[in-house]
Amino acid sequence: MGVPALFRWLSKKYPKIVERVKEDTPKKIRGPDGEIVEEPIRYENPNPNGFEVDNLYLDMNGIVHPCTHPEGRPAPETEEEMMVEIFKYTERVVNMCRPRKVLMMAIDGVAPRAKMNQQRSRRFRAAQEAADKEEERREAIKLFEAMGHAVSEETANHKSWDTNAITPGTPFMDLLSISLKYWVSHKLTTDPGWKDLKIILSDSSVPGEGEHKIMDWIRRQRSYPTWDANTSHVIYGLDADLIMLSLATHEPHFRVLREDVFAQSSKGPHACKNCGKVGHIAANCKSDKKFKDPNVAEVAKTEDPKPFIFLDVACLREYLAVELVVPGMPFPFDLELAIDDWIFMIFFVGNDFLPHLPSLEIREGAIDVLLKIWRAELPRMGGYLTNHGKVNLDRAQVILEGLAKSEDEIFQKRKDDEERQEHSQKRRRIEEHKRQDEDKAREEDRNTLTLNGTEYVAVDNPAATARGGPLHPSLPSRPAFDLVPKEDAVKQPEDQDQKAKKAMAGSNSDIVKNRKAIRMANMSAAQALKAELEGGNDVNVDDKKAIAQEGKEEDEAVVTVERTEDEEKEQLTKEEARGTLEEQGEKEGVDEEVVPPAIQTDEDEGEAPVGDATVAENDESTIPEDDEDPTHVPRKRKRGDSDGDEDSNEEDDDDDDDDAPPNPEADQPIPKKKLKVNADGTVDYEDDVKLWEPGYRERYYEKKFGVKLSEREFIDKVTKSYMEGLCWVLEYYYQGVPAWDWFYPYHYAPFAQDFRDVGSMDIKFETSIPFKPFAQLLGVFPAASRIHLPEPLQTLMIDEDSPILDFYPPDFEIDMNGKKMAWQGVALLPFIDQNRLLTALKSKEELLSDDEKRRNSWGDNVMFIANENPLYDLFCDKLYGLRAKDVSKPIPIDTKASYGITGSVLPDPNCVPASTFDTPIPSISECPDLNPNDSISVRYYFPRQAHPHRSILLRGYKPEPARLTESDKDWVRRGGQGGRRGHRHNGGGNGNVTGGPGMARGRYESGPPRTNGYQPPPPRSNYGGSSGYGYGAPAPLPSRPPVSSYGGGAGGYGYSNPYAAAPNPYAGGYGAPAPYAAGGYGQRPYVPPLPPPNPYSAPPPAYGRPPGGGYGYGAPPPRGGGYNPYPSRR
């Protein structure tokens, strides 16, 4: 989810929710022939973390990304090698958790249109970043060639792997799907610990985001009485929204697994990526950038694998049970609905579908601000903001009004904090530069020797490395430096240049005699080339001061999509200079190898989410900062020209139809600002909105939307669209996709002050279907990634006569929108016109091959089981046996044999029991054909949902022992002030718990771990075990009897408008809160209590239309919901 700092904020505010994972590692033993071999981990052993896991869910995109383009080490060379890395990583994660019932692996499929806008932005920016890096690599090669060295053809023609391939419908995703099927079959055949597992693979051909497909499966399963209310879940993934999704299931035994990104690397302290020295970061470095030989491949450094951590959702629920209690409420407290309100308020701060409100930044305490308003207004609202995934619009207006009162103060405080931070950073930078100068002076003192009144200095001796070291094996290496008088050292470069010129004009013998001088001249030429490539020249200190002064008056901005006329001339001059220097390098080159300095192309430090693309935030070529100008900012050339972008905007205007959503960016082009990216990823720019000054609303709407504040009708359209988005997101998290084609049609959010009459908004979502994979690729890919599309579709992205050419601007503007980091900027891309895109795609479909048509179709979930699983014989008999002929209707799963898992199955046409599974990666010798294959696969269909998801704990729930002490709770009630907050030192179910002052430490959850994955854990003593000490906190008593998921109590059922005011909460006592009923959002009639309608009441047609779940309220409930579990024959 789009809240990069959410995980850190949660772990600091609620420290006990984080546990370090205890992980078994393979032991090295001596084999039968005396060789050292690794003994595999015994999966069937008890979980070392002290608790057993029933179901493990893997958001596979969180595994694929770090395996295909890892940080800190070279990426795998081929896609087959990437598959092996994915296998290794997945097995490590599975061995940490050791699920006993279900392992579900979900890959992102076609996303809802609301998410595709964000995907489009990321992929365009990733392509732009890749182009910048490729340009820098080619410049480095030119520099190396100018030094007189050859660059291999392989190095010169090397192309980096395009990370945009990780998108549904590409050949890479097709390979990933079949490779995971192979690996799962291999594990079921060879690992006895997997024999009882049911593995569900939902690949990229099944519509929906990976984590939402997982949650949809959980919601459907828990709507049946066969579901175990005490099922323990773990979900792996890197997205912060997994925490919200886990809470939204109201399954209390849930943990989120992820890498500990804040763990200290085993490589030791980080070195500067500019100079390679320890003690400072690249942003504060004064040294020249290092260079490396482009022919030398990067070698991975050995380091310990990153540790993992659990985020304990049950513990987070304990914190929220304290945090969300409001004294003196006129209605009963319901923790489940209060948690829903808390989740909804986080959506205001950030999500993947809407830009966050300008006044809300999580780093500024935005969640606490909203929570404070919610606590103050909850008694007056008379009920909760949300109701089982529906928003009460009248109550949402109350929260927005409370935020509106604070917006001016928030903006002013933000400006004060930024100025204070900038002053502090400038002071630290100056101090760091002073320290570097002192270190440099000490180094020079060490390299200076006074002898007989003459001062000698050490100068580099390239001859020491010219031929690789010693003259003869019996002789020592040449020294790496010479001692020369200081006066001669100053004149030496000049003399070397003169010698080189004379030698090159002479005979071959002159060249040989003066090869040292020629080599030094080549290196000088290379330095000149570097200065030209970086937009600078070799100048003295006084000249640098003049340039720095000039720079204050001239525009040095970079990372824009347009070049000015002056910049075009400057670029032409640079190209001429490069050509001259290259020619000089070829003429003056000698046949000797010189080990050059390293060419640094790594990214500098900057904070950005895993897998998030940035716009040249870290890879700019930099000019070394002058000692007397520590705040000098490096420059970067601009890319692209303005004509293409202007044309595309014109086409957008001409082709917009009346049915398309409003697109103010197309109607009112925003003046493009020029950006300047620093070494640390921050951006220097002029903020022309100035939210901290009076009149900011007028400036904001004029700059961002191209309208005046007085145009109230337009602003009302923006606020309604935004409120639609909030309702869409909440329902997406709780009930499934409301509408696949809905999206927020603006790049910016309105102010809280501008929402009015929210309760009267008529919000409806119409039923729709997801895109096909190739339609999504055309909707999110830039033209640079067209190689992943079939050839007939590639022309739509580049041909001048393409009807959708304007969807693929070669350059685009990044608006920083008040942010500091480059990756936080807003990519101002034109929104896709769905009708035009689908029409263009249809015109090319006849040209697709059969295999390409298969890739462009929806697929099925697949379930794998081993031959020892109780379901194996049933599947073979009913699906693959002699009596199983022409099976066309899905067969229900026997819930007794599946331990409560429901659904239906059909034969997998790619599976023949007991046959050989051909390897999809034949180039990998460790992955041969699988023979015999002791597993079986079937097409698996999720069960229809028996009733809408409800925010309650299921009957039979058994609470875990309390994590929080009374001291912890008091600390939370005080808002984290006073006392000492508790935290966990060790991971696992029996980590140490530290309370506030004077509290004894004890081990909770002592006693034997669960050994049976299918039974609830035995009662555990709170008074320690053999390994514990002290006393643990007793388990809390439930505030009221568990409420049945099927009714329980006489709760006040429904009012036809789920977003209207609720009836008197006292009407039904402690019954379940009122779920929603079908009806228009803006209508307010009250109806007598009725059972909640079931949008899943009629089973979906076995092969009907794909979902929508997105029915209009007021219309009859649709058949099915979420996404269609039977997509194969749509």
Curated annotation (Swiss-Prot):
Residues 411-447, 541-551, 570-588 have a biased composition (Basic and acidic residues). Residues 411-448, 533-678, 965-1036, 1072-1130 are annotated as: Disordered. A zinc finger (CCHC-type) spans 270-287. It is found in: Nucleus. One of its GO terms (molecular function) is 5'-3' RNA exonuclease activity. Residues 987-999 have a biased composition (Gly residues). GO terms for biological process: DNA-templated transcription termination; mRNA processing; nuclear-transcribed mRNA catabolic process; rRNA processing. Residues 1086-1104 have a biased composition (Pro residues). This is 5'-3' exoribonuclease 2. It comes from Cryptococcus neoformans var. neoformans serotype D (strain B-3501A).
